[in-house]
């Protein structure tokens, strides 16, 4: 089946042809580990996890290499470490911040059903590669040293007259437009407003390494050089796919292209550039000042959003309901809809436990192969779910034949959910089962109190919330005539 992907550089959807089908290579920009990941950060993680799964499905698990970096050297990390651990030496405080944040990031994305990348390199483990690229750029006349800084010159790149890509081509901006949009105050060590930092001197106490290009003062890398170095180390000078959020197109990805292409004298850093759209919350831009800033952890473990916590499958399905290139409005209504859909799938798979290993249906793979159209793929899931729960063909048939057809559809639904990374937990582990049961009992207790106070509105709300989880309540009385509520999973 032909995979077609939208390329940000060429601005069209075209067939994806890997450089080497036996070694398909993808790089995605990962987190800067200074704070817990918010729901906007979750979108590229989920989107490119689905692409990783699809590539493995099409080319074989052993033939796909996915690299997602960890940025563990950055001004924001330094600031957070100094704030949170004022009594510690800065380097020790930085280690605490980065280790804690990276651990929380992994817990969060694991809960969202994401596979770990093939390689997850840290920036601080690739300083040697960064220095090597910088040395190449200085030697080639694309970078210069000024006041213990090393800076890249886009003007020098564009002077190559077609031998290299034009700086600004990924973002579709001219150099003049970028100069006009630059801030009035240009750092004194820059020759031009568009020049950007590859390396800078470290202040006393800050992380530092021996500097490149003959600079005596120890320093540290700029942000953009980190990804060029890590992608080069693990994927080579040119690779198949580079992904990230739309906010990274300029300047980060534009600068990556400049560094890598000029250092290695290539026309393309990546064959295909993919970017997911923005996320807003209830129709507004997410920001702490508006009070709608929410982390993945808060969604999973608190009642901050919508008055309840949400499971990872619900969050993932809600994210995938919108095509990755479109903006997404993160709303309570959308999560409730996703939760109901997960509950429907769960009930179906509970009915058909066990099952057989079957191929993912053509309709699901076809949808995903059309520029990762997860919205269309979910429509296919809904159709499979309906087939598993009713007769959709005409003509006389035996009950056994009908049940067999239902079971096949359920098996195909299970395989499709697995490809999309959506775990509906049809067979919960003991620990998860205990948490699930405890949560239900807690809600029943709250509902019982509401009924005792004749708060029928609250009682109905909790009943509906449990119904969305696939739980059916039965109200009755015990042997002493006291009200009692029992529950079971819907069938």
UniProtKB/Swiss-Prot annotation:
Cofactor binding note from Swiss-Prot or TrEMBL: Binds 1 zinc ion per subunit.
GO biological process: cysteinyl-tRNA aminoacylation
CDD domains for this protein: CysRS_core
EC class name: ligase
Binding positions for Zn(2+) per the UniProt entry: 29, 227, 252, 256
Subcellular location as annotated: Cytoplasm
Pfam families in the record: CysS_C, tRNA-synt_1e
One annotated GO molecular function: cysteine-tRNA ligase activity
Cofactor requirement: Zn(2+)
Signal peptide: none
EC number: 6.1.1.16
Chain ranges for the short sequence motif 'KMSKS' region as given in the UniProt record: 285-289
Reaction equation(s) it catalyzes: tRNA(Cys) + L-cysteine + ATP = L-cysteinyl-tRNA(Cys) + AMP + diphosphate
Gene3D superfamilies named among the record's database cross-references: Anticodon-binding domain of a subclass of class I aminoacyl-tRNA synthetases, HUPs
Motif 'HIGH' region positions after renumbering to this chain: 31-41
Record keywords: Aminoacyl-tRNA synthetase, ATP-binding, Cytoplasm, Ligase, Metal-binding, Nucleotide-binding, Protein biosynthesis, Zinc
Lineage: superkingdom: Bacteria
CC per GO annotation: cytosol
Residues given in the record as ATP binding sites: 288
SUPFAM superfamilies linked: Anticodon-binding domain of a subclass of class I aminoacyl-tRNA synthetases, Nucleotidylyl transferase
Family, as annotated: Belongs to the class-I aminoacyl-tRNA synthetase family.
Complex formation: Monomer.
Protein name per its UniProtKB record: Cysteine--tRNA ligase
Gene assigned in the entry: cysS
